[in-house]
Amino acid sequence: MTDRPTPGPADLAAMSDLIMPMAIRVAATLRLADHLADGPLTADALAAKAHADPEALGRLMRYLVARGLFESTSDEEEREEGASGQPGVGQGEGAGVEPGAGVGRGGRAGVEAGGRGRFALGEGGRWLLDGAPGSARKWLDLEGFGGHMDRAFFELLGTVRAGGPVAAGNKVSLSPEAAGSYDELMAERARAEGPALAEVLDWSRFKHVVDVGGGTGAQLIALLTAFPGLRGTLVELPASIVTAQQQFAEAGVSCGVLGGNLFELELPRADAFVLRYLLHSFEDDQAVEALAKCRKALEPNGCVLVLEASDATPAVFASMDLLMLVLGHGRERTLAQYDDVAAAAGLSRKAIYHPTAGPRVLEYVV
């Protein structure tokens, strides 16, 4: 039994609606919030910036205005505001628009598709601004890795019937564009979580840290910056290594690199191996193999640090596990399941660390 509320028909309809999720993703992909960041635009002007059809974009915007992500004014409101001299939303000092050309809140859905009224960025739409703190735009971009994940769910029926998708979507199989988008998303997360990881345990006890599957090196940059005496090596696919070397140079840190497929490489010896959001990408046999390769390369008294999300929030845990299913590889695991996988690789858990941001850290030793 559970004390969670039982969804009614209206709740189910809202939960199953695909219009809002797709409309938001199209807005993110077309960068509509960024195009409106400097002030209101007509549908024609916005369409020109977004490389979209003005009439179709106007209809999309009318929906997003009704949902509160953007603001609008009709042609009639434009004339009324121009006559009265009263500014609308976004028309104050520094807004970069002429008097009388602002956007009124009273006409949220007042723009006819293809009309000459203006659209402006609403408060809710600011989460779609690229680069803004907490921005979701890159995750929602249908042309990036976020879109790759989203589209995979349209194959959920076949996946559930067959036990897995027709084609796996791990990083090795991604297109260069999708793989680059994935690296960028993971780097943003690593930069945000890196300081907390550097503080949660004493990295000065290590001489050499190897980050296995560390993307473009954002996590290693955080560690090597906080602990200058630490030596680091990044193990990644060759395309990611190229970007990582540029990032290391820009950050002014010295870091070794080893490019190739983890399962085909001989890992360098080190006293700490870091696997961040990596094992959940593997089924159990591959996870055991990855951990065993790290164990064999450990210096005496070394450890393997597994960074994976906690299963403390069931809804989030279940969502991520379903995502791994439709992507065709890996699974989320409970603490006990990670311990079992580690044991099969000849490792046992020594400690758990809980950073103030990011995944928990599981320390495994021989």
Q: Which residue stretches match the model-derived regions?
A:
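Alpha-helical subdomain
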Residues: 1-81, 203, 208, 212-366
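Intrinsically disordered, low-complexity terminal tails and inter-domain linkers enriched
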Residues: 73-116
